[in-house]
Amino acid sequence: MLFDVTLWIIKRVILDYKEIKKYNCISNDNFYISLNLSIDEIQNNEFIDKAIELLNESKLENKSNCLEIVERVGIKDLHKIVNNISRLKNAGFKIAIDDFGTEYSNLDVLEKLDADIIKVDKNFVDGLGQHLIKNETILFILRVSKKEEKSVVLEGVEDKEQDNIIKGFNSKNVFVQGYFYNKPMGKEKIKALQYSS
């Protein structure tokens, strides 16, 4: 099958989730692991069937795995994507729109795709506190997301100034991702965190 690598990654994520969830450093009940999907994968019914089958077999609780839709190329079949997102959510996956604000992503996509999480691209975070349009765009996304009961992840937070500005938004639905908190790490490094605290 064309998407065997991604399906293997989903299996691996399911196994890793079960192990990492037991670590002492993971105290949040909202803990989940994300992986990226391409537009081609989200538009492929056979791939969606297999992904749902893997999650069902795993017996994991709902929302323990998040599929991030990476929109690097234009959407070919919006109706099929909307339908497949609905199927994935009903099966228990979280859905995120990754790198929002780049390439083809736009407000129309936000309205039509029933994502749980909007991940705002690092390009917007880089301009925080310096560029009016970037600040106002993020504030707008936060307001809309709050009304729609969606979470927002601001990507690429790399310093205290950016972090302080984001904290100043005083929004309960905003989360951050970036080197200011941690670089990406493997399972063994996550495991080591439980002994360092």
Placement of each model-derived feature along the sequence:
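Catalytic core of bacterial c-di-GMP phosphodiesterases, primarily the EAL and HD-GYP domains
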Residues: 2-80, 156
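EAL-family c-di-GMP phosphodiesterase catalytic domain
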Residues: 22-23, 38-43, 64-76, 93-197
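Charged helix-capping and loop-helix junction motifs
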Residues: 49-53, 80-83, 132-139
